[in-house]
């Protein structure tokens, strides 16, 4: 079954420490007309991730210094983070920003940084059906709020793969399924399981951004000749005529 693990904030992991846990309760902006906008409880992306708390009145020009938009996508609310700089901010569509008028605004973010917090990750290990200690590692990350492609797609396929592998009558390898916050969670997991991973894992896969309608793509391992590369390149040619094959130089997620 699913095993869940917690690492306390402040724990030494290689050359860094697990950061304080960010807790967000609410956030919004009150306009000069008294309207409440950028409500966290209506859309998580309205608050800068890892934002410091704020409760102040300020002018539009002052507020704009803390607002993030995507001008070339005028209706989109961007996903912006502040790891690990202590600053505050809001995210909104560029259309909404352009509609704001001069006057006094009230910016409110109810958040805190828990020095006694924790980082959580989980794993499921499905054993082989023959005598074999070698493993296939399959991971996905869980840390981007209210996002479909760059978040939910990975865990959704991860869950389906767990079901699929469990139902296999014959399994040559053991399967290690890991789900954790991107980057920091994976670093913690490697730190806690390094010797086991080094001695047993023969192939690894990271499920990232697999929920859009673009071409199937794969980022190869550094040597481009691992078991995971061979299996992926063999499979991908049977499901698409136009795969995107990237070298390891294009890494950007937990495959790093």
For each of these PLM feature ranges, what is it?
Residues 1-256:
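N-terminal hydrophobic/helix-forming segments and targeting peptides
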């Amino acid at each position: 079954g699913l095993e869940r693990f917690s690492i306390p904030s402040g724990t030494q992991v290689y050359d860094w420490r697990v950061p304080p846990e960010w807790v967000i309760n609410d956030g919004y902006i009150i306009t000069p007309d008294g309207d409440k906008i950028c409500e966290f409880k209506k859309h998580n992306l309205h608050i800068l991730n890892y934002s410091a708390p704020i409760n102040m009145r300020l002018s539009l020009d002052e507020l704009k210094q803390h607002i993030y938009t995507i001008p070339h996508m005028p209706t989109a609310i961007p996903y912006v983070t502040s790891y690990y700089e202590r600053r505050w901010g809001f995210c909104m569509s560029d259309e909404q920003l352009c509609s704001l008028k001069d006057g006094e605004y009230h910016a409110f973010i109810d958040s805190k940084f828990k020095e006694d917090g924790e980082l959580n990750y989980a794993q499921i290990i499905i054993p082989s059906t023959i005598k074999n200690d070698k493993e296939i590692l399959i991971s996905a990350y869980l840390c981007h709020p209210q996002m479909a492609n760059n978040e939910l797609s990975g865990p959704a396929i991860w869950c389906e793969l767990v079901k699929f592998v469990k139902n296999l009558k014959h399994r040559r390898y053991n399967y290690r399924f890991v789900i954790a916050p991107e980057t920091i969670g994976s670093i913690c997991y490697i730190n806690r399981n390094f010797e086991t991973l080094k001695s047993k894992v023969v192939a690894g896969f990271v499920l990232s951004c697999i929920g859009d309608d673009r071409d199937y793509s794969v980022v190869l391992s550094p040597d481009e000749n691992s078991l995971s590369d061979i299996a992926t390149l063999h499979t991908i040619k049977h499901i698409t005529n136009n795969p995107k094959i990237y070298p390891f130089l294009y890494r950007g997620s937990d495959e790093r």
